[in-house]
Amino acid sequence: MNLQEMNARKEKIRNFSIIAHIDHGKSTLADRILEQTETVSKREMQAQLLDSMDLERERGITIKLNAIELNYKAKDGETYIFHLIDTPGHVDFTYEVSRSLAACEGAILVVDAAQGIEAQTLANVYLALDNDLEILPVINKIDLPAADPEMVRQEIEDVIGLDASEAILASAKAGIGIEEILEQIVEKVPAPQGEVDAPLKALIFDSVYDAYRGVILQIRVIDGSLKVGDRIQLMSNGKEFDVTEVGIFTPKAVSRDFLMAGDVGYVAASIKTVADTRVGDTVTLASNPATEALKGYKEMNPMVFAGIYPIESNKFNDLREALEKLQLNDASLRFEPETSQALGFGFRCGFLGLLHMDVIQERLEREFGIDLIMTAPSVVYHINTTDGETLEVANPSEFPDPTRIENIEEPFVKAQIMVPNDFVGPVMELAQRKRGIFLTMDYLDANRVNIIYNIPLSEIVFDFFDKLKSSTKGYASFDYEISDYRPSNLVKMDILLNAEKVDALSFIVHKDFAFERGKVIVEKLKKLIPRQQFEVPIQATIGNKIVARSDIKALRKNVLAKCYGGDISRKRKLLEKQKAGKKRMKAIGSVEVPQEAFLSVLSMDEE
């Protein structure tokens, strides 16, 4: 293909993604677009075709982004090449969204005709605007009885400030308005910029590990072109590889002769190690390298940390391999080895948020068959010591001696909560209970409010989202971003079982709530830990001070069963003997802590 043909082809390319809040019909719309452009035959079609992970289908959420090439014959008789990049909509996967948007020129904004704009929609729209994307509003689900497209149109104009007079009314489920959406993509989304004859620059926006071909990179080519046999260089570390295959996804991988500026596809170059390929890195040709890298993604910092331990200690290496493979597709997962006296060897992992943590845990158990124990999630605290040092600590067991601590700072988030009017009371009550600091409250329209709070991340980490959903009957939508670190009156609480500290049960708590929390947890553990042959005291302590205690009574055999009547001194002798035995047992006995006990530390305020 000569330069002229390449440029002509580039003019026909449209790269776009679909952004929406959870459940506004994004994956269904993607399915319809695939059907309409006949990318997928009716026979192969199944619901949520792009959500290829079992987990994604079960939970009905999109976790990983997907990129697909479609051909569309427009009304003007020309055939256009569409690249649809599917994105997740959940708070924790904002990073995945920012990666997909960096590879696009336009975005379809899907808003539910019955629900209107939600917090997460807003967050994603701002990401799209930051990337200078052309945004096409689509009002979806207009066939619902509760749909009110005109109200939503007004909302898009008022809240986001987009002109919604030409917003397309559609129903992805019934297939209404799909043709119009495709035509608008042709008209409004700009063709990719970029020079076909410039040195190669391509952005890695995802990577997948294939047991046979090594690491497969998903790339968006910005400048230049790439073919099999080229030697590529990664700009962040200068490593070079020979390209063995290039191609595109039409959900399935299809190999091609070359990829050129504007294309979205994949490259296999027998890259062995996961660590070599950073998402957000720039790929260029070793023979004719680009002078400067593309501006990459910002590094996402994990906000929530938890210990992951294999239940069978000989599975430690399997767990490491599994985490390395997951990290390959999941740029935001971090982990490092750690040991715990109670749980043996494991890893301290960093996640973007709770759903992310859940999904990783489930994938480890499901895809790699490893049984896990997870410890209570914690956040990163900044500890200023008396000798002027600042420590960053994510694991409660690494806290320094209380006498060395000058003060402790914890991360606060700026939380946006959108709720119907009727639920403002319960939401504010919940936020106050979680030590929230009220900032502002805006009325979006007659019946929806946007409330903004500063809340400590550690309070959100536990169960804030579930509590929010249950106190608003599921109507609230919630989005947060990290704002800053602030000093707080925090203490570390340890749990002692049979006078031995269980490091995996330690947690950080605000001093005002320490007493209640200690009481709740001690009672909870009492129910969960099975009775032993000897009495087990459970104590919650702060430093050397015991704040709560409860005892698990011993199981005992009735040693008097065989004394039919008889002398009291005989009975006393048997009882004393039993007592001495229990005492000896207690001195050397150790207590098994079941997995539920670790989780009970999490779901603290449920009673």
From Swiss-Prot:
Biological process according to GO: positive regulation of translation
NCBIfam families: lepA (TIGR01393), small_GTP (TIGR00231)
Family, per entry: Belongs to the TRAFAC class translation factor GTPase superfamily. Classic translation factor GTPase family. LepA subfamily.
Primary localization: membrane
Annotated GO CC locations: plasma membrane
Nucleotide-binding is among the record's keywords: yes
Molecular function in Gene Ontology: GTP binding; GTPase activity; ribosome binding; translation elongation factor activity
UniProt catalytic activity: GTP + H2O = GDP + phosphate + H(+)
Pfam families in the cross-refs: EFG_C, EFG_III, GTP_EFTU, GTP_EFTU_D2, LepA_C
Protein topology in the membrane: Peripheral membrane protein
Family matches, as HAMAP family: LepA
Protein name: Elongation factor 4
Keywords assigned by UniProt, alphabetized: Cell membrane, GTP-binding, Hydrolase, Membrane, Nucleotide-binding, Protein biosynthesis
Intracellular or extracellular location(s): Cell membrane
Gene3D superfamilies the record matches: 3.30.70.240, Elongation factor 4, C-terminal domain, Elongation Factor G (Translational Gtpase), domain 3, P-loop containing nucleotide triphosphate hydrolases, Translation factors
EC id: 3.6.5.n1
Biological role stated in the UniProt entry: Required for accurate and efficient protein synthesis under certain stress conditions. May act as a fidelity factor of the translation reaction, by catalyzing a one-codon backward translocation of tRNAs on improperly translocated ribosomes. Back-translocation proceeds from a post-translocation (POST) complex to a pre-translocation (PRE) complex, thus giving elongation factor G a second chance to translocate the tRNAs correctly. Binds to ribosomes in a GTP-dependent manner.
Keyword Iron assigned: no
Gene that encodes it: lepA
Residues annotated for GTP binding in this entry: 23-28, 140-143
Organism: Lactococcus lactis subsp. lactis (strain IL1403)
SUPFAM superfamilies in the cross-refs: EF-G C-terminal domain-like, P-loop containing nucleoside triphosphate hydrolases, Translation proteins
Domain tr-type G: from-to ranges: 11-193
